[in-house]
Amino acid sequence: LLTIFCLLTCCFSQAQKQDAAFETGEWFKFRIHYGFINASYATLEVKDDYLNGKSVYHVVGKGKTTGFASIFFKVDDNYESYFDKDTGKPYKFIRKIDEGGHTKDIEIDFNYEKEKALVNNKKHKTKTEYDIEKNVQDMVSAFYYLRNNYDVTDIKEGEEIMLNMFFDKENFRFKLKFLGRETMRTKFGKVPCLKFRPYVQAGRVFKESESLTLWVSDDENKIPIRIKAKLLVGSLKADLDAFKGLKHPFKIIVD
């Protein structure tokens, strides 16, 4: 579930660097529904940290099934990214998950001088180097990089966005299409949003390549407001449930 969430938050149109969209202390909580069942919660938090003597942002993402859903399919996911405060480049990515008994425990260290990623698979006790593309991002750092470096002021309906990403042991190009602007009803009030269609590989999880829709707040924060996904079995919806530490005012329309 957190895998889907992190992947979908990468969706802004390129422009010159703008005022920072986030700061240390930002925290999001998302309520995730599978059909009519309140299946899980996911959180994202921005912290200050040090890595190899350098001051970095450390983002921690967690996802866990709750209540009735955990009886049938237990999920306990942890994602972490350490990335540069100025450039947004990721230095280390951690993915430790347990999804219904399917487990992974992976750490990735990025070396930009060698243009390599060292993948430490702790579960299988292997270390392997892979070539990486320029301006590569991991699943978590991409969200924060795009929020700080991309602008959506003049984005046009139908415009497509591409991003270089590295995941587990693979480089891939992530594509999204802008579908337009829409005002969403939320627990906080009406929120003006940007609507996107991320393209994903159909198969084990998703029904088809256009199975996902994402709404992001149309303000300086660029907060993920809602995600909808058509799965091979059923459907999934994630809504922003709580937040704190926003750098900018949250644009809400009050009736």
What are these model-predicted stretches?
Residues 1-18:
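Bacterial Sec-dependent N-terminal signal peptides
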Residues 16-112, 152-255:
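Acidic, serine/threonine-rich low-complexity disordered tracts
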